[in-house]
Amino acid sequence: LVDDDPRRAAGSPFDTNPEGQYHTRMKKIEAIIKPFKLEEVKDALGEAGIEGMTVSEVKGFGRQKGHTEIYRGSEYTVDFLPKIKLELVIADDRADAAVQAIIGAAKTGKIGDGKIFVSNVEDAVRIRTGEKGASAV
């Protein structure tokens, strides 16, 4: 008996769910970037064929820490710097293209450029239709 279904081949972007149905593996990409880079990153992702994302204004710091400002003659330290958090869930085989697009558009070469986190996503459900998997995103 030969199983020639390409969805079961090594490296295939497909998995089976508990019901035995095939679905495309997905990745969640979270990127923390400088606010002024948002439009460039959005455009780069669009050029890579990646549409749809969630954008949040966040604050944080990494190695660059905060900075000192003077307000009404008093000096104070701003510990948390404004950043933008992008979140997108895409098919597994599109993750590398998305990461490269973000790096290409967000990188300035200076401290504070940000981070990208990539993780596996078990499932996604479109609330309106109940559609599941990669077709839901």
Predicted regions located by residue number:
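Positively charged, small/polar-rich N-terminal and surface patches that mediate targeting and assembly
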Residues: 6, 13-137
